[in-house]
Amino acid sequence: MIVVASPAVVREIMRRHGISPRKSLGQNFLIDLNIIDKIIKAADLTPADLVVEIGPGLGALTARAAARAGKVLAVEVDRGLLPALAEVLEGAGNVEIIRGDALDVDFDRLAGEKTDGAFGRGGKKYKLLANLPYYLTGPLLLRLLLERFNFALMVVMVQLEVAFRLTASPGTADYGALSVAVQYFTEPKVLFRVPRTVFYPPPGVDSAVVRLALRPAPAVTVRNEDVFFQVVRAAFGFRRKTLLNSLAASGLGPGREAWLEVLKRAGIDPQRRGETLSLSEFASIADSFLDAGGQ
């Protein structure tokens, strides 16, 4: 295997394969082994683990994960990177490279197929590692959570501002629908900040590594999860409006007067704003909406 730990190594690999970093895919390759080893430590990998890595790039993190885990499935969307990735990981017999878009891949099915059913839906939980570009972070995390893929934890690199959103508290500027979804399903923790200088090419912003440990059960109990998230999205749809106006304008439910009654039943002031509500308050609104005949 090739140790990808400097700009010179990245440039040489790309020169040999006639490729260059694609800005449209957010390709900034992590080249600091100290940071990589901290990510591996955070994932607490053992030979019993299956790791699914999303966006392996040139394989710097993949190689380190392969040294600890039983098997690594590296899912890469960029077909042009695959020969370079294969070269870097040559000799790593427990790594399998899969060309695929993380927004489409059925990770549970993939895990099951590659482990004869030992992992994935109906099997053991696996671990996810990812260095996520900004454009992909929200949609992918929501998909992974809402589709209930059978992972035990995720350790992800995200832009620093996104890390703040994942862990934000009600009443703060960073708190939003993504915060609610992540905190509903997982216990998120920002582990450490990552300067832009440890990537090649360096991005325009700093990043952070976040650990998302799946909760044994969601943070709050709701009668209908789909309705809960519909209410959350509606409440954050118009951040400058009051909660009542946001819900009434969302198209969800029969109208303003009905929403006023729903909020009254839930014990929520209609003049509040969505970003001030806790998960339990969103749950109360969703259940009250169902009591009023919503669906």
From Swiss-Prot:
Subcellular locations according to the entry: Cytoplasm
Molecular-function annotations in GO: 16S rRNA (adenine(1518)-N(6)/adenine(1519)-N(6))-dimethyltransferase activity; RNA binding
Catalytic activity annotation: adenosine(1518)/adenosine(1519) in 16S rRNA + 4 S-adenosyl-L-methionine = N(6)-dimethyladenosine(1518)/N(6)-dimethyladenosine(1519) in 16S rRNA + 4 S-adenosyl-L-homocysteine + 4 H(+)
SMART domains attached to this UniProt entry: rADc
EC number of this enzyme: 2.1.1.182
One Gene Ontology term, aspect cellular component: cytosol
Binding residues annotated for S-adenosyl-L-methionine, in chain numbering: N28, L30, G55, E76, D101, N131
Keyword S-adenosyl-L-methionine (UniProt): yes
Signal peptide residue numbers: none
Superkingdom of the source species: Bacteria
Keywords, in A-Z order: Cytoplasm, Methyltransferase, RNA-binding, rRNA processing, S-adenosyl-L-methionine, Transferase
InterPro entries: KsgA/Erm (IPR001737), rRNA_Ade_diMease-like_C (IPR023165), rRNA_Ade_Mease_Trfase_CS (IPR020596), rRNA_Ade_methylase_Trfase_N (IPR020598), rRNA_adenine_dimethylase (IPR011530), SAM-dependent_MTases_sf (IPR029063)
Enzyme class: transferase
Family named by the database record: Belongs to the class I-like SAM-binding methyltransferase superfamily. rRNA adenine N(6)-methyltransferase family. RsmA subfamily.
Function summary: Specifically dimethylates two adjacent adenosines (A1518 and A1519) in the loop of a conserved hairpin near the 3'-end of 16S rRNA in the 30S particle. May play a critical role in biogenesis of 30S subunits.
Xref: PANTHER family: DIMETHYLADENOSINE TRANSFERASE, DIMETHYLADENOSINE TRANSFERASE-RELATED
Designated name of the protein: Ribosomal RNA small subunit methyltransferase A
Organism ancestry: Bacteria, Bacillati, Bacillota, Clostridia, Eubacteriales
